[in-house]
Amino acid sequence: MKKFLKVWSVLTIICMTVVVFGGALVTKTGSADGCGNSWPLCNGQLVRLTDVTPEKLIEFMHRMTTGISSIFVIVLAICAWIYMKNRRETKPLAIIAVLFLIIQALMGMAAVVWGQNPYIMALHFGISIICYASIVLLALMIFEVDRKFDARNLVMGTKLRVNIYALTIYTYLAVYTGALVRHEKASMAVPVWPFENGHFIMPTSVQDYVQYFHRLAAFILIVWLLYVTWLVFRDYRRYRVLTFSMVLSLVFIALQAVTGALSVYTGVNLYIALAHSLIITMLFALLCYLCLLASRSKSNRLRIK
């Protein structure tokens, strides 16, 4: 059973990664209306080879991969619930994974049938990364990463725990601003990075405000992440799980900044934009894992005593 769970959890992560990629691809290529206003079929029927368009194919494939991923997520949640029922985090994570998967699908359906609001569609991406993060956490528990990094003895102080919780919430909000940039079609509102012609220009449109707000949010995120990393290396260097996680998070945020800048310089190159979406998804999942470790800190302290 354990071997099956390991294989299945990896396959589920791969499937959810494809879904995240697919959703970003739909947005980047403007394929959201590729299947008309019917759901789950395209214009009320399966795609016929005689009338295939790139937009229709992208949208239909996204729906199909979402359906397949749903099966993987539900099976993983049920099996983890049964096999790891003695772990206190298993049931909440399994419920979150399935619940947010359903919400994500319903929001996608609503957007197709009743039209797309950019602020709601930006939240659609945020829902998907919560589902993704819960699947990653279940997989890490299945692979017993805690034991490999000796995380069972990890004890965090209040300052670090509060910063990790707050940073994770803030990262989610920053992700929302990035998704809003895409859905408000503001990616090239300020075509030079970080500012227009090297100078700050007062925004004159909604797209300008959205773009500037996202860049400000990203800058604060980088500074905050550097601060938390400094805290870890100053006070918790003996815990490999923390030092490794923070180094990895810095790699992610550096790649995120680079792909963000390159997205502007290349006129929103499709592959760079997709990488930009995937990297922040993985960073959010990593921060959620740190939240999981922080939530265990008090019980670890009592157990060690």
UniProtKB/Swiss-Prot annotation:
Organism per entry: Listeria monocytogenes serovar 1/2a (strain ATCC BAA-679 / EGD-e)
Residue pairs linked by disulfide bridges in the UniProt entry: C35-C42
A GO BP annotation: heme A biosynthetic process
Residue positions of the active site: E59
Name recorded for this polypeptide: Heme A synthase
Residues spanning the membrane: 7-27, 64-84, 93-113, 123-143, 161-181, 213-233, 241-261, 272-292
Cofactor: heme b
Location relative to the cell: Cell membrane
Cytoplasmic side: 1-6, 85-92, 144-160, 234-240, 293-305
Protein family per UniProt: Belongs to the COX15/CtaA family. Type 1 subfamily.
Metabolic or biological pathway: Porphyrin-containing compound metabolism; heme A biosynthesis; heme A from heme O: step 1/1
Subunit comment: Interacts with CtaB.
GO MF annotation list: metal ion binding; oxidoreductase activity, acting on NAD(P)H, heme protein as acceptor
Protein topology in the membrane: Multi-pass membrane protein
Keyword Phosphoprotein annotated: no
Domain notes: The N-half (TM1-TM4) and C-half (TM5-TM8) domains are connected by an intracellular loop. Each domain is formed from four-helix bundles and they align in a pseudo twofold symmetry manner. The N-half domain is the substrate-heme O binding domain and the C-half domain is the cofactor heme B binding domain. The cysteines of disulfide bond Cys-35 and Cys-42 may be involved in transfer of reducing equivalents from quinol in the membrane to the active site of the enzyme.
Extracellular side: 28-63, 114-122, 182-212, 262-271
Keywords, comma-separated and alphabetical: Cell membrane, Disulfide bond, Heme biosynthesis, Iron, Membrane, Metal-binding, Oxidoreductase, Transmembrane, Transmembrane helix
Lineage summary: Bacteria, Bacillati, Bacillota, Bacilli, Bacillales
EC number annotated for this UniProt entry: 1.17.99.9
